[in-house]
């Protein structure tokens, strides 16, 4: 149940908030929001949220980004 709520929040962000930005800003593939969905789906709410937050903290101008899939 909580997993579905988290994924719904991320999907809401992807559909309504992310398009407001002028250009895509995520430095990674898959995007941080897609990574979060995959992490929560694969590892559950606690570990998935932890992995997603860790990934979001890496998404800044001083990190090179690149291909970073869920392991």
UniProtKB/Swiss-Prot annotation:
Protein topology in the membrane: Peripheral membrane protein
Signal peptide feature range: none
Principal subcellular localization: membrane
GO cellular component assignments: plasma membrane
Subcellular location: Cell membrane
InterPro entries xrefs: Membr_insert_effic_factor_YidD
Pfam family, one: YidD
Domain of life: Bacteria
Keyword field: Cell membrane, Membrane
Keyword check for Membrane: yes
Membrane-spanning parts: none
Job of this protein: Could be involved in insertion of integral membrane proteins into the membrane.
PANTHER family attached to this UniProt entry: MEMBRANE PROTEIN INSERTION EFFICIENCY FACTOR-RELATED
Family: Belongs to the UPF0161 family.
Name of this chain's protein: Putative membrane protein insertion efficiency factor
Lineage of origin: Bacteria, Bacillati, Bacillota, Clostridia, Eubacteriales
């Amino acid at each position: 149940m909580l997993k579905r709520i988290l994924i719904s929040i991320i999907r809401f962000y992807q559909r309504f908030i992310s398009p407001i930005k002028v250009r895509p800003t995520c430095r990674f593939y898959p995007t941080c929001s897609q990574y979060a969905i995959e992490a929560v789906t694969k590892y559950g709410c606690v570990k998935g949220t932890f992995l997603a937050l860790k990934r979001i903290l890496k998404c800044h101008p001083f990190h090179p980004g690149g291909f970073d899939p869920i392991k």
